[in-house]
Amino acid sequence: MSGEKDRADTGLYCVFGNPVSHSRSPEIHHAFAAQHSDPVQYEKREAPLDDFAGAVQAFREAGGLGANVTVPFKEQAFALCDAITERADQAGAVNTLWWDGDQLHGDNTDGAGLVKDIRNNQGWTIRKKRVLILGAGGAVRGVLGPILAQEPTLLRIANRTKEKAEALAGNVMKGEGPPVLGGGLDNLMGQFDLVINAISAGLHGEMPALPDGLLAEGAVAYDMVYGSEPTPFMRWAEQQGAAATADGLGMLVEQAAEAFEIWRGWRPNTAPVMASLR
């Protein structure tokens, strides 16, 4: 890891995405760095859709030490790495890059960030709860391992195309772990204690139709999407009687803190940063 040894000089980092103009990552990482007067420069870089590898190489040549990766490049980042962590391997996607000599390393901090936000910031438990995840894209694949490590009673993945949800459930199902079930949104049944939305359409005001009665008494709802006001999914959950709802801003900050610690060798305090972003 790059860690403390880089701290004498300004460390150059970035977030790769396309589009990336909306990203709040520079704001977050500069706020982290300010906590210890750690000299960090963090910028947004829009990588061409057809040349992510070239963008990474150009950043390295410009003196870059590490990077975050957002949509749609996480799978490409995974393929580019010389070495990856176990949780990145599990996710099949990388959101955090750093160089050690000439070796490009990759990690996936999304699931750890989600679990930290749910447990530490929201004060919700996952252990022995019935968990429903809406969606089966890359965002879901990145968080399944850390959620299952919390030992829920069961985990159901529901997606518009049920085959994708079934395939994802089959990939992570382990004999000794909690049951992981996959299926379509149209035949979704049962009651759940924690519902997590990872359908990206939720950003633009379009939630798929969901049946009534999915939320058990005392259930909580978490949207991996975040915005300046409650998301359509959060509003749906409130109408369905959720005891509490949260958006994904805390996950964004917590996964960023995990990445920052890999790069700089110390862990920032996330609470004041979350408060300032609101």
Curated annotation (Swiss-Prot):
The residues the record assigns to binding NADP(+) are E86, G135, A136, G137, G138, A139, N159, R160, T161, K162, E163, K164, M224, G248
Annotated Gene Ontology cellular component terms: cytosol
Gene3D superfamilies assigned = Leucine Dehydrogenase, chain A, domain 1, NAD(P)-binding Rossmann-like Domain
Which keywords does UniProt give here? Amino-acid biosynthesis, Aromatic amino acid biosynthesis, NADP, Oxidoreductase
Q: Name one GO molecular function term.
A: shikimate 3-dehydrogenase (NADP+) activity
* Record EC number: 1.1.1.25
- Which pathway or pathways does this protein act in? Metabolic intermediate biosynthesis; chorismate biosynthesis; chorismate from D-erythrose 4-phosphate and phosphoenolpyruvate: step 4/7
Please, which domain of life does this record's source organism belong to? Bacteria
List positions binding shikimate.
Answer: S23, R24, S25, T70, N95, D110, Y226
- Quickly give the catalysed reaction: shikimate + NADP(+) = 3-dehydroshikimate + NADPH + H(+)
The answer to whether the entry has keyword Cell membrane is no
Query: Which residues of this protein are catalytic?
Result: K74 (proton acceptor)
Q: Which GO terms describe its biological process?
A: amino acid biosynthetic process; aromatic amino acid family biosynthetic process; chorismate biosynthetic process; shikimate metabolic process
InterPro entries assigned: Aminoacid_DH-like_N_sf, NAD(P)-bd_dom_sf, SDH_C, Shikimate_DH, Shikimate_DH-bd_N, Shikimate_DH_fam, Shikm_DH/Glu-tRNA_Rdtase
Give the protein's function.
Involved in the biosynthesis of the chorismate, which leads to the biosynthesis of aromatic amino acids. Catalyzes the reversible NADPH linked reduction of 3-dehydroshikimate (DHSA) to yield shikimate (SA).
Outline the subunit composition.
Answer: Homodimer.
Q: Which family does it belong to?
A: Belongs to the shikimate dehydrogenase family.
Show the HAMAP family listed in the entry.
Shikimate_DH_AroE (MF_00222)
User: Can you say what this protein is called?
Assistant: Shikimate dehydrogenase (NADP(+))
Could you tell me which species this protein originates from? Answer: Alcanivorax borkumensis (strain ATCC 700651 / DSM 11573 / NCIMB 13689 / SK2)
